[in-house]
Amino acid sequence: MAQRRPAGKKIPFQKDSFLQQFEKLAQSRKHHVLLESARGGRYSIAGLDPIATVKGKDGITTIKHGDEMLFKEGDPLRAFHSWFKTLETETNHEFPDFQGGAIGFLSYDYARYIENFKMLSLDDLETPDIYFLVFDDIAVYDHQEESLWLITHVNGSDQETADVKLSELEQMWLTELPAVTSREMKPETAGSFAAPFTEDGFSQAVEKIKQYIASGDVFQVNLSIRQSQSLSVHPYQIYKTLREVNPSPYMAYLETPDFQIICGSPELLVSKKGKLLETRPIAGTRSRGKTNEEDEALANELIHNEKERAEHVMLVDLERNDLGRVSRYGSVRVNEFMAIEKYSHVMHIVSNVQGELQDGYDAVDIIHAVFPGGTITGAPKVRTMEIIEELEPTRRGLYTGSIGWFGYNHDLQFNIVIRTIYATGGQAFMQSGAGVVIDSVPKHEYKESFKKAFAMQRALELSEEETKIR
């Protein structure tokens, strides 16, 4: 059988038209996904018609590919990847980085397949351990050139089939469609935020962590709080609002019949392009100032704060060590150190770490080396994960997992799931946390956790207000 290859064409397209057409096309599809960099990135990716869906939970992975249903046991990512490798292609260097492949997520709880620790917390949401949609046909918007790449896959030199498929994709994206029908939830389901982790419970957990730190178990632990609220608007409306309220580098909207994901993450877990590996840890947070002067003063205080600097350096070292597991010896380097990045409601300290992939390692090895990100667990990573399992009342599910893609061309990119809403059963769930160290004050860490959720809460509130006005 001839080897598969990507085929593509580029057409002029306006950014607003891309988002409007995606929303119109998505209305009639049960599964669809949009990956965007609403802050400085070059490409946005739309997937509308997956050739396969992949779900892994509790050691069983289900792959639905056309009329075929496969069931595999064991590590769900390895099970999926063993099947996915049969679809792989070589890179076409004229095309965008993502040229087709799998888009989806790894939940935080996927870490249980990498590190062996006890399952103590409640799995109340039953979020899949992994979930992916596999796309042969994709649309990639190039913000730099204001053009739309349409990409499909064919066998070998079959240009005739490629031309037909690309013509169909072009017609789909250029055809004038009716305006989007409002997809509202029942108004009576709207409600206020509820958090099962009370301030007293959180404070007790912080004190317990400080005991672990004092006894030498760990240096720092990220402790989080989950909130929930009944939904009164469709999740995609919330996503549209979030991208305006808090544009971020690693945004995502994923819709399935069972759940929807609204992600505004600022943080990269890992990317691979050719042999180049990158991770971009974030550690250190302050609120934005109300004036330029206050903003600069807060940024200056953050970057010179000894506690924040020490925590950041520790986590950069952790990420260097993780990346070093799969990198050529001597290739790991920090090419950007302790920069300030500002978002709508908060600012962060950010660094960038690079390495060169060692021969013999594949995509699963890369994920196993770095997942979950150390900035959202703590250090040392495995012991902090055991403590999180002991102290947080429910499983994290999607929170602090990763959303992203595995390309047919062996490349990959995954974020860290923060600033994210997981919608299911008419409820919106969001989670945020704070890094606890030896001198942490419980009430301050409690407030910081809620501060990080403000952009998500604001997006929900504005979406509801807009629906009422209509």
From Swiss-Prot:
Gene3D superfamilies: Anthranilate synthase (3.60.120.10)
UniProt cross-references to PANTHER family, sorted A to Z: AMINOBENZOATE/ANTHRANILATE SYNTHASE, AMINODEOXYCHORISMATE SYNTHASE COMPONENT 1
Natural source organism: Bacillus subtilis (strain 168)
Function: Part of a heterodimeric complex that catalyzes the two-step biosynthesis of 4-amino-4-deoxychorismate (ADC), a precursor of p-aminobenzoate (PABA) and tetrahydrofolate. In the first step, a glutamine amidotransferase (PabA) generates ammonia as a substrate that, along with chorismate, is used in the second step, catalyzed by aminodeoxychorismate synthase (PabB) to produce ADC.
Keywords: Folate biosynthesis, Magnesium, Transferase
Name of this protein: Aminodeoxychorismate synthase component 1
Molecular function (Gene Ontology), one example: 4-amino-4-deoxychorismate synthase activity
Position of the signal peptide: none
Repeat listed as a keyword: no
Any one biological process term the GO annotation gives: folic acid biosynthetic process
Database matches in InterPro entries: ADC_synthase, Anth_synth_I-like, Anth_synth_I_N, Chorismate_C
Record pathway: Cofactor biosynthesis; tetrahydrofolate biosynthesis; 4-aminobenzoate from chorismate: step 1/2
EC number: 2.6.1.85
Named cofactor requirement(s): Mg(2+)
UniProt lineage: Bacteria, Bacillati, Bacillota, Bacilli, Bacillales
Subunit structure: Monomer. Heterodimer consisting of two non-identical subunits: a glutamine amidotransferase subunit (PabA) and a aminodeoxychorismate synthase subunit (PabB).
Catalysed reactions, semicolon-separated: chorismate + L-glutamine = 4-amino-4-deoxychorismate + L-glutamate
Mutagenesis / variant outcome for changing A283I: Complete loss of aminodeoxychorismate synthase activity
Cysteine pairings via disulfide bonds: none
